[in-house]
Amino acid sequence: MDVNVTSSTVRGTTRAPPSKSYTHRALLAAGYSDGATVRSPLVSADTKATARAVTAFGGAVEPESGERFDDADALVVDGFDGRPAVPDDVIDCANSGTTMRLVTAAAALADGTTVLTGDESLRSRPQGPLLEALGDLGVRAESTRGNGQAPLVVSGPLAGGEVAIPGNVSSQYVTALLMAGAVTEEGVEIDLTTPLKSAPYVDITLELLDDFGIEATPVGDGGDALDGAAGAAGFVVDGGQSYAPAGGSYTVPGDFSSISYLVAAGAVAAEPGEPVRIEGAVPSAQGDSAIVEIVERMGADIEWDREAGVITVRRSELSGVEVDVGDTPDLLPTIAALGAVADGDTRIMNCEHVRYKETDRVSAMAEELEKLGAKTTEEPDTLTVHGSESDLRGASVDGRADHRIVMALAVAALVAEGTTTIRGGEHVDVSFPNFFDAMADLGIAVERDGAGE
């Protein structure tokens, strides 16, 4: 689907979509339980892949009140109580890397063989460190092509034990092992061989596990317990635990990765004197809430009422800043788009791991912003956007089949002279299905071609 975005101003109130990261974890945690309700879930292409996996393991995921699955305000999960059945068929994770990694560890608990695959993009993403870790724990876990990429074959059962794993490729490996380790006989002790990147995503996992009654602990070099994942040398989760949220239900918070595009839109294109208000911005463990501090450093007029969960942002003159995205990789596209509008240089550092997402997001943003007239410099671990040298004009750009690239380019298109055509607009369904509807409600001039095809 092509989406045409014409230079526009925005105003009004919108609501953040529920968190994709929390929804994935909550659906699987409910699957590990003997039953739980997930309230305010994000129902998207990615999270539906996790729901299908829970069903494949012998659970069931249904809307609470008989509404359409896509419109569900709550999903009732009939769990498999920590003992996943061997699936009758291959588990297709579609485009969801989170699903594949979390479900690969869950598959290791089954007393038999599970096969997992995904779309072309997912079949190119690295799974090798997780497969090696499961192998070290006594599970057969292999790539059918021998390259550490899907399709994957996993044969359990997993009893638990101690394992070493790198922390600089994907924090999802840690999340997968912690979630599965809680229901093993022996528990799992994880030693990190390299410093942990994207630590806030593990904090999300630790927070959610606690809400489901699971104790998991980050530890330092001396084995002492830490308050959070940052700086951890490893993690410990005891086995034999049971997943059970208080009151039998769990409520998903708003998604700060998605909020970042709404904040950026307000910062660069709010109608003079008219703010953009974003509801549902309740504080949580999400590292991507750093977007508020980042745009404030750039000079944005922004306020965050944490108690009410409301962010208010007005258009301002922005200046370039330096940002380390080691812990917040999903913010890189948003920051790059802001940098193309700001005065001076915006230097995005510590971003090599962002190259291993749905696409190489570093190169993708550099190349697509260049099409719009931005000037960029790309290095292996750094992306610099030269805002003062940029003159954004409408052009045809490629969303690279990546939801975050599509949404970031839509933000840049708000201030590009004329009309910008973004190819692959349908991919927003991965994390923010009503993104273009929400933007249209704020006043963006948007037309969709082929939406019904």
Swiss-Prot record:
Chain intervals with Polar residues compositional bias = 1-12
| Pfam families in the record | EPSP_synthase
Gene Ontology process terms (BP): amino acid biosynthetic process; aromatic amino acid family biosynthetic process; chorismate biosynthetic process
| GO cellular component entries | cytoplasm
* GO molecular function annotations of the record: 3-phosphoshikimate 1-carboxyvinyltransferase activity
Q: Where in the cell is it found?
A: Cytoplasm
Q: Where is the active site?
A: D330 (proton acceptor)
Which keywords does this chain's UniProt record carry? Amino-acid biosynthesis, Aromatic amino acid biosynthesis, Cytoplasm, Transferase
Q: What is its main location?
A: cytoplasm
Question: Looking at the record, which segments are called Disordered?
Answer: 1-21
Q: Where does 3-phosphoshikimate bind?
A: K20, S21, R25, S170, S171, Q172, S198, D330, K357
Q: In which pathway does it act?
A: Metabolic intermediate biosynthesis; chorismate biosynthesis
**Enzyme Commission number, as recorded:** 2.5.1.19
EC main class here is transferase
Q: Binding residues for phosphoenolpyruvate, per the UniProt record?
A: K20, G97, R125, Q172, R361, R404
According to UniProt, the reaction catalysed is: 3-phosphoshikimate + phosphoenolpyruvate = 5-O-(1-carboxyvinyl)-3-phosphoshikimate + phosphate
Q: How does it assemble?
A: Monomer.
Instruction: Give the protein's function.
Output: Catalyzes the transfer of the enolpyruvyl moiety of phosphoenolpyruvate (PEP) to the 5-hydroxyl of shikimate-3-phosphate (S3P) to produce enolpyruvyl shikimate-3-phosphate and inorganic phosphate.
Question: What PANTHER family does the annotation carry?
Answer: AROM/DEHYDROQUINATE SYNTHASE, PENTAFUNCTIONAL AROM POLYPEPTIDE
- Protein family (similarity comment): Belongs to the EPSP synthase family.
What is this protein called in UniProt?
3-phosphoshikimate 1-carboxyvinyltransferase
- Origin species, per record, is Halorubrum lacusprofundi (strain ATCC 49239 / DSM 5036 / JCM 8891 / ACAM 34)
Q: What is the lineage of its organism?
A: Archaea, Methanobacteriati, Methanobacteriota, Stenosarchaea group, Halobacteria
